[in-house]
Design a protein with these regions (language model features):
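N-terminal nucleophile
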Residues: 1-279
Length: 279
């Protein structure tokens, strides 16, 4: 399963949308090197998932390919706010081709997956996050927007969205509130990297078997570009850099900087390593 968090970070007067997740797939075994965030082929948005991989991965690939098949979606003439409707239609359309159901079953099983579409809208000049989920009452996918926190001071701006198993999500929410209260930011200010710290600690503590592996992280900027950021995992001392959930091999590198999970204030160039001859 998953614990995924999307939030608007405000630092130095600049806003960026951060999407982060654990990297574990489970089901009789733990596989801790899997992408749960997919950069869509239009630079300003990503889609992430929580739930059953057999439902999620095909639909995320359908979303990716559908953008390639429709030029306005790829060149961003279709704004992010309309892209979510396109993806809803793609998901529903794809499920029409499920057949050979068990004897006596009339409709396919409900998909056990939830998605988060996160990105920057050139129309509204804002970051947005929507959860896409299957609504059994209408028999199709629908979406719900993430909203800003209420009861905040005038200078505060907190937009955050969680996807994942109920227990880890509830734990993450409680920890974030406690952390913000301890730092005097519960009603004032904006989110920085506090959600990252919460995700980091939950993974490290190993309290939830469905949540584990390296943190994967993507940043989306107001210039409408999304980039995957590396994370030293389990810590900087290990020297191991993970990108989109997978630890890099010796001869691989990343162009977009690396975060120290214990000092996540900024992404820095990776520590120098000796080049490795590749076959």
């Amino acid at each position: 399963m998953t614990l995924g968090i999307s939030w608007v970070r405000v630092a130095g007067g600049v806003r960026e949308l951060i999407v982060a997740s654990d990297s574990r797939l489970s089901g009789g075994q733990f596989w801790d090197a899997n992408p749960k965030i997919v950069l869509l082929p239009r630079s300003d948005a990503v889609i992430s998932f929580a739930g059953h991989t057999g439902d999620a991965y095909p639909l995320m690939l359908q979303a990716y390919n559908s953008i390639l098949m429709y030029p306005p979606a790829q060149n961003r003439a279709m704004d992010l706010e309309h892209l979510k409707g396109h993806l809803n239609r793609v998901f529903d359309h794809s499920r029409k081709f499920i057949s050979n159901l068990p004897r006596g079953q009339v409709v396919p099983d409900e998909p056990e997956a939830k998605f988060a579409l996160s990105g920057y809208s050139w129309k509204s000049k804002k970051f947005h996050v929507w959860t896409l989920h299957f609504d059994r009452s209408i028999g199709r996918f629908t979406f719900k927007p993430a909203s800003t926190w209420a009861a905040q001071d005038e200078d505060a701006y907190k937009l955050i969205c969680y996807i994942g198993d109920a227990d880890p999500v509830a734990e993450a929410k409680e920890r974030l509130v406690s952390l913000l209260r301890a730092r005097g930011k519960l009603r004032s200010g904006s989110l920085d990297m506090e959600p990252f710290e919460v995700l980091r600690d939950i993974i490290r503590e190993g309290k939830f078997g469905s949540v584990g592996g390296p943190i994967q992280l993507v940043k989306i900027y107001e210039h409408a570009n999304a980039v995957p950021v590396g994370v030293y995992w389990p810590d900087r001392a290990s020297g191991s850099i993970s990108v989109l959930g997978r630890p890099l091999m010796e001869y691989e590198t990343t162009r977009w900087g690396v975060i120290d999970p214990d000092q996540p204030d900024r992404a820095r160039p990776p520590d120098a390593v000796d080049p490795v001859d590749t076959p």
